[in-house]
């Protein structure tokens, strides 16, 4: 059965909606597609009730359909007695093929022309099938069929032709779909093993579970979409109904075409016959073709295609990277079947493909043992997973990988390109080795492996390939290569995608991303080598997602929890909801007891540090009106709130005496590091801080030198601190200063964000450039005898000097070059101007 709203993952609500406030019952209106005639659709019943419920009226065709179903069972019994099971199986195989083609091809053609030209509706109007005065036998039969099918109060002449022809079309659909199902079941029955079924076998248990799940999918889908979408009603008329997300439509894209056919594979698993499995796959493929060529075009025509209207998507970021970096090209990607973005002028692409070919040719030529292949594969996987995970872990923590390239004169994009090569190579090499190992194992075990295992394993591999394809489609190259670890500055809007496969799963790579690996274990009859490999693949994937990807995502996009479609559906199930409620009650009880015990402890130790911390936090959050007028935290005004290095930052502060502590301190932070929490600083100041009172930090002269003024009276405490080159952060960005309490990290006050940037140096004249560099380094105490020195300022080192040159002149000079010329400013100035001239000459 198919549902044409599965593409948009939506469903129409029931035709009757109860209004609680008035107690009235409203019916959903509908209108015809072309003539726009409005009407209230009559009540209809689902296929099973229409055919088999004795309490519901039956039309002539419905009686014929029901009889044909029972006749097929009787015919199967007689055919089996006379011609044997083998011939009976072939007979019903051809019947199933006929009815499946009638479904996907026959119904598909009718719906295609109905969608394009409303052919069925036009045929009904042309032949006056529902006209009272019509005397044709076809019209009389159609009117008789509808009158016997519908309730006694139904008057077909009060309804438009679109609705009446849809009712007749349903009869045609019932016949084909019921025969399709019946002949498939009879074909499977004839294919069951003659020795019987062992219900303790894992295949029986898994297959039965798949069938039961399939039944739930069908039932829940009909609960959500009703007869209107079940029978392709929007090909004939349109309902004025609300679109909702519910049930099975939250679990999977196209649920009636994807997981709605899971029972096919469950039956094939129980049957244990690879021929049944192949026929099931064939039927499933036809259903996807029906979806692609019949339903999807109609959906796009009626409801529009699903497209990302947000220009700040990952795809937009990819385009932006290409636009801003002319030497950047899309990275090489393996789709499992072919290579995308192969660049003949990129050496790393040749290296990747030649490496894979070399591995394959060496394996074919040397014919390594299974043990050797296993050891090589597991080693390659562990090493590649560890290496890439380490890079991303360090990159998330302190931009380690980017810093390596920047300090050597390379760009951020170049760093990202090298990472793309490393990640892609680390992905395809272990995968290639796994394919070789699995192929070798299957070859050696071939006589003892069933075809069904190989086919099911291939299906799992296909699921993983599909999952990877859907992930790439949803998050584009930028997301696939973890661009938010390297190019955070390209992310204009920090919002996780909820499109494509991410509408249903939060981490599809953790759930479906290893399906193919377990498919190899199935194909090799669960040999211990492939089970170990599958465990390694799954474990490394889980560890990476849990301990590297999730923390980084929280840091970049915030801690907001997004509930996936699958999660919503599971929460809606009553048994699971009861379990959730029990855990919530336990958690609430525990939390109440914890709060009560904390209150008791606070009452007995009012002067404790814990009590002080709670008091300060309460003062911060409640913003006590009495104390607020005495709280001041101001920066020296600057045009556009910009500080051009190395000028100092002057900060004036004032606090009520009740809130002040001698151990209070002020820190300088990048706002990107502190944006997640305004009341507590969770990142280190990295030494960019100073105390507010020398008395509080008597032994720390380095961090009290910035104190310029300090005054204290009976009501307030105030002072002035100046962040000069000894405390400034010599990295351009948006910053803020935060006032912290009592040597801790609770924030009492914070400034408005301001910008720190390097000055712009004129590079067309060497003498002017040299003078500007000398002037800058003199102010930061990092010059001696016309040369740059590192020991003059704690935070202005060679790396910072290299960054200054890049930001102020637009020309990169590597750290190695600076060290090579011993920091000589004349040589550096000459080299910068020389590079500028060379670049200009190439334009």
Swiss-Prot record:
UniProt keywords, alphabetically: Endoplasmic reticulum, Lipid biosynthesis, Lipid metabolism, Membrane, Methyltransferase, Phospholipid biosynthesis, Phospholipid metabolism, S-adenosyl-L-methionine, Transferase, Transmembrane, Transmembrane helix
Compartmental location: Endoplasmic reticulum membrane
PROSITE patterns, per the entry: SAM_CHO2
Reactions accelerated catalytically: a 1,2-diacyl-sn-glycero-3-phosphoethanolamine + S-adenosyl-L-methionine = a 1,2-diacyl-sn-glycero-3-phospho-N-methylethanolamine + S-adenosyl-L-homocysteine + H(+)
Main location: endoplasmic reticulum
Residues annotated as transmembrane: 59-79, 90-110, 172-192, 202-219, 255-271, 278-294, 344-364, 373-393, 419-439, 445-465, 517-537
EC number: 2.1.1.17
Membrane topology: Multi-pass membrane protein
GO molecular function: phosphatidylethanolamine N-methyltransferase activity
Pathway, per record: Phospholipid metabolism; phosphatidylcholine biosynthesis
Superkingdom, natural source: Eukaryota
Transmembrane is among the record's keywords: yes
GO BP terms: methylation; phosphatidylcholine biosynthetic process
Xref: PANTHER family: PHOSPHATIDYLETHANOLAMINE N-METHYLTRANSFERASE
Protein name: Phosphatidylethanolamine N-methyltransferase 2
Organism: Vanderwaltozyma polyspora (strain ATCC 22028 / DSM 70294 / BCRC 21397 / CBS 2163 / NBRC 10782 / NRRL Y-8283 / UCD 57-17)
